[in-house]
Structures are given as C-alpha cells and as structure tokens.
Curated annotation (Swiss-Prot):
GO terms under cellular component: plasma membrane
Name of the protein: Alpha-2B adrenergic receptor
Alphabetized Gene3D superfamilies for the sequence: Rhodopsin 7-helix transmembrane proteins
The organism of origin for this protein: Orycteropus afer
Ranges of compositional bias, category Basic and acidic residues: 239-249
Matches recorded under InterPro entries: ADRA2B_rcpt, GPCR_Rhodpsn, GPCR_Rhodpsn_7TM
Cytoplasmic side: 26-36, 96-117, 181-352
Amino acid sequence: AIAAVITFLILFTIFGNALVILAVLTSRSLRAPQNLFLVSLAAADILVATLIIPFSLANELLGYWYFRRTWCEVYLALDVLFCTSSIVHLCAISLDRYWAVSRALEYNSKRTPRXIKCIILTVWLIAAAISLPPLIYKGDQGPQPRGRPQCKLNQEAWYILSSSIGSFFAPCLIMILVYLRIYVIAKRSNRRGPRAKGASREGKSKQPHPFPAGASSARPPTLTSSLAVAGEANGHSKPTGEKEGKTPEDPGTLTLPPSWPAFPNSGEGQKEGICGTSPEEEAEEEEEECEPQAAPASSASACNPPLQQPQGSRVLATLRGQVLLGRGLGAAGGQWWRRRAQLTREKRFTFVLAVVIGVFVLCWFPFFFSYSLGAICPQRCKVPHGLF
C-alpha cells in the first residue's frame, strides 16, 4: 500500500511539474521573467521525484541499501542539493514578490530575464555549497557496522547544524519576515487607496490652467466657444466672448472650433457645439462622443458632460492633444488604473505563494527539527527511528 501511494505521488509530481514548465514556456501570458523561478523550481521537484524518492522508497521497503556505496554518497548529496534548491527557490520568489510590491518602478526595470537567471544561478550555487561538503570531506566514519549496508546522512554535529540552518531555518525565517512585510504594505495600500484616488481627482480638477492671471476662481473654466488661433487655423470665424454676453474680464472660458463638441457649463446651457457639422476626418470621433439633445426647439446638440465627469476626461483626450487639460486627465487616470491592476495581481499572486510556502514549511519542519536534535543532544533527545 505504501509503495502504491508513493508511486502515485512520484507520477503526480512529475506530471504536474512538467505541465507547469510546459505552460510557462508555451503561453505568452506566462512568459514574464519572474515565472522563470517557477520553471527552475519545477525542474528541481522533478529531479527529486526521479532521482531521490524511488531510491528512498527502495531503501525503506528493503530495510538496507541495495545499491553501491558510491551511489549512496552521490544520492545523499543530490538529496540535499535538490531539497535545498527547492526551499531557496521559494525564498527567492518571496523576495521577488517583496521587491515588486515595495519598489515597483525601480525593481520592474531591473526584472529582466538576464537578472532572473542570475538569481536562479545563485540559488543553485547556494544549494551546491550546502550539499557538496560531505562528498569532499567525509570525516571520521568509524568502523563499518556488520550486516547489511546502510545509507545514512552525515552524522557530524557541525554538518547537521550548518546544513539545517542553510537549507531550512534561515530561508524559512527570511520568508516569514518578507511575507509579514508584504502583508503590512498591502494593508497600508488598501487603506490609502481610496484616499489617494479622491485626492488625485481633486488635485486634477484644481490643476492650474494656461489662462491669464486675471481669471476668476469662482467657478472652473469651461470649454464653450472657439479659440481664436484654432479658429483661424481651421478657417472658421466665431463670435468672441463679448458677443456671447461675456465680459472681457472673464477669461475663464476656453473656446473651441465649431467642429468640436461643446462642454455645457452648469446653469448656463451654452449650445455652441454642433454635432454632425464637423469635417469628414473627425466625423467618426464625434459620433462616438456626441449624443444629440432631444429638445425640439434646439438647433444644436449638447455633446458632453462637465469636465469633472469621467466621460469628459475621455472626450478631452480625443481632441488630438490640443486641449492639454483633458489629455492630462486621461493619461493620469489610465496610468492610475494600470498601476492599481498591477498591484492587485501582485497581491493575489503573493497570497497564493504564501499558502504554498506555508504548506511547504509545515511539511519540512518536523524533519529538520528532529534532524537538528540529533546534533544538539544525541542521547537525551534521540528521536525514534520510525518517527524520523
């Protein structure tokens, strides 16, 4: 029964991690540089399932090491190498998540495939530095026990403690601290998000405009009539603000050509913009933005809501960059939403990785804890062989 369960786990591990590698390498949406960590981690798990678990299963079922002694030493070194690599990979992924959340702009510019590959190489070098000492320095092995051969890990206290700290306890501590820090940042971001959004909109609505110094601040400027420069460039003539009943001292109204949609000011109801009278090259744009009024007595159509509305920001952004205010609002809003969506994805991925790492730590902690007790107090704290 144990052999059947372990065999199923071996096949499941190989198949599942192979799918992970295949998905990352073939899917365009998963070709982000940070996903190379998952490819390397999946490769380490496949190596554990193919080169370590089958021989461990045979050793447990037979009760002795059936294979050669040389392979026993290589097998133990590979066991430490692959398992340490898996744990350090998770530590590197947690650090990558932390840098992506806390230093998004700075770190994303450095998160290139080359940089990720260098980090992965460092992870494997750390794992190799922990696993190779038993192959190089074998120490005092003492007399070999009679009977059937056994294949056991290095029993020297210095190696047990150093390998346990480097393979598990240090990476585990780093991951816990990093994910606590990510949680604090995410919680602070959630609290500050709505306030920052409101402050950003308020700041944009009160942003200074390129109007004369005498402009009144009693109400926000509106786009009602045509600009003199724009009107002359387009060959249109339009009454000035004085003919419209405006005083020369009221420069708070910015003018648009007749082909541009009007932005009605609250309480004044200007009807300067005429939908459908624009040139042919701008007809499609204005048809999307303008909706004619249903009033029968009106010969013109009020096209767009006030500037403070999201629709107004979008309309201004379509005026081919000639109205800087609308263009800035659209760009800032789009950038804010892109940033918000990126943070949401980062937080979701961080939560999933936290669950995976938590399960991983719970699985490995009993082994490394009991393994370390053998070096600290080999006689009093000896763990039963069956439990170990």
